[in-house]
């Protein structure tokens, strides 16, 4: 695993998710994004593709990460991008925990924190996802 910084991109929560909330997307319209880069097996990539929805909301793009090289990333398909999308608070918290665990700088974390969020209206899902957040926190992230 490695981390890097890619110029000219920005992080948004404007990919329409199946649950109606905004999910992460990178878009070539910003000052830059911090990235975590993993080397995974082909079998694990197939599993990740299914989880992330490759071909059903996300496609792939190559990001050129300085000192690392070209890396595959998911990017929202244009028909799934809705600038009015707002992410759920638990989802944004998971993104922040991951960004913090990877040592991304405070100004980047604050930029993520500044993005709008809303409470998940599905009580059962909300409680389940916040339990996930607490498990991640308990794991030291």
Task: Place the predicted regions along the sequence by residue.
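Glycine-aromatic micro-motifs
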Residues: 1-141
């Amino acid at each position: 695993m490695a981390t890097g910084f890619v110029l000219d991109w920005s992080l948004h929560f404007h990919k329409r998710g199946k649950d109606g909330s905004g999910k992460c997307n990178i878009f070539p319209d910003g000052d830059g994004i911090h990235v975590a880069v993993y080397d995974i097996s082909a079998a694990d990539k197939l599993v990740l593709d299914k989880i992330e929805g490759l071909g059903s909301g996300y496609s792939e793009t190559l990001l050129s990460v300085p000192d690392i090289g070209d890396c595959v990333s998911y990017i929202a398909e244009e028909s799934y991008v809705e600038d009015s999308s707002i992410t759920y608070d638990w989802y944004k918290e998971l993104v922040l925990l991951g960004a913090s665990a990877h040592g991304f700088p405070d100004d980047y974390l604050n930029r993520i924190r500044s993005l709008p969020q809303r409470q998940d209206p599905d009580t059962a899902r909300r409680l389940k996802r916040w339990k996930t957040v607490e498990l991640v926190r308990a794991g030291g992230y």
